[in-house]
């Protein structure tokens, strides 16, 4: 199975790499084995909301940043294969709904 990087996965890798941590160090923070955390960083496995919260606390960053990346990945996942104009229109509708 090929790597399916996501914006959240890329951010999680960057946070760990910037701090020169090993994946086993971060895996223990969220209560998973290192191979599982590695798959999360590659975008091959989903991460649970409570695990995102633990990572935000561990890295001392705003949870909203991680939630926004998670949601952006979900939108991209659903929009894959759709014409760009349809996706833009759908996002516009959501923006209006959220105002």
What positions do the PLM features span?
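Short alpha-helical DNA-recognition segment
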Residues: 20-39, 54
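Short, charged recognition helix plus adjacent turn
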Residues: 67-99
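A short, Lys/Arg-rich alpha-helix, primarily the initiator
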Residues: 1-18
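DNA major-groove recognition helix of helix-turn-helix/homeodomain DNA-binding modules
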Residues: 48-65
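Short, conserved catalytic or interaction motifs in soluble domains
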Residues: 42
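Residues that mark the N-terminal boundary/hinge immediately upstream of a DNA-recognition element
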Residues: 11, 22, 48-51
């Amino acid at each position: 199975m090929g790597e399916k990087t996501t914006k959240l996965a890329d951010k999680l890798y960057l946070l760990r790499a910037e701090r020169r941590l090993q994946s086993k160090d971060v895996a223990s923070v969220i209560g998973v084995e290192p191979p599982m955390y590695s798959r999360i960083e590659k975008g091959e496995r989903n991460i649970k909301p409570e695990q995102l919260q633990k990572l935000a606390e561990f890295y001392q960053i705003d949870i909203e940043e991680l939630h926004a990346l998670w949601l952006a990945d979900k939108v991209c996942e659903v929009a894959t294969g759709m014409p760009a104009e349809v996706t833009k229109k759908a996002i516009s509708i959501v923006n209006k709904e959220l105002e």
